[in-house]
Amino acid sequence: MAQQEKKEKIIYVVTHGADDPERAILPFMHANGALAMDVEAVVVLLGGAVMLARKGFMNHVFAGGLPPLKKLMEDFLAQGGRLLLCTPCIQFRQIGESELLEQAKPIAAAIFTEEVLSANAVLNY
C-alpha cells in the first residue's frame, strides 16, 4: 500500500484588525490563494485581530485597492479554511463565544504551537 502524501499547510498569523486594514486583509487574500492551490490554509488571529472574528465586524474593514475583508473571509471559510483565535485575547476583550463567527475556533497556546510545528510555513502579518 502506498503511503499517503501529507498535504502542504501554511499558517497565516494576523495581529492587526481595523487599526491596519491592509495588514488585516492581505493574509486572507493569500490564504484564499493557497486554498485554490489545494494547500491547507489556517488563519490565526492574535491580539487586536481577534476583533475580525466578531459577527459583522468584517463588514467595516476596507483598504483602498483591495477586495473587501467580508468577501475574502466568506470565501476563505467557504473553501474550508480554518479560523483560529487566541483564547486569552478574546477573554481580555470580553468577547463572548456567541459574538463570534460560527466557524471561528478559540484555541490555547498548546494548540497554536501544535499547528505551527505541523506547518510547512508560518507567515506573520
Language-model segment annotations:
Residues 59-64, 99-103:
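Short, flexible loop segments at the rims of nucleotide/cofactor-binding pockets, characterized by
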Residues 92-118, 123:
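C-terminal structural segments of small proteins and small subunits
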Residues 60-87:
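A glycine-rich helix N-cap at a beta->alpha junction
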Residues 35, 77, 116-117:
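Anion (oxyanion) recognition and catalysis
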Residues 41-47, 83-87:
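Short internal beta-strands
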Residues 49-63:
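N-terminal beta-loop-helix "entrance" segment that forms/cooperates
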Residues 12-25, 57:
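Short, glycine-rich nucleotide/cofactor-binding loops
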Residues 24-38:
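Histidine-anchored nucleotide/phosphate-binding helix
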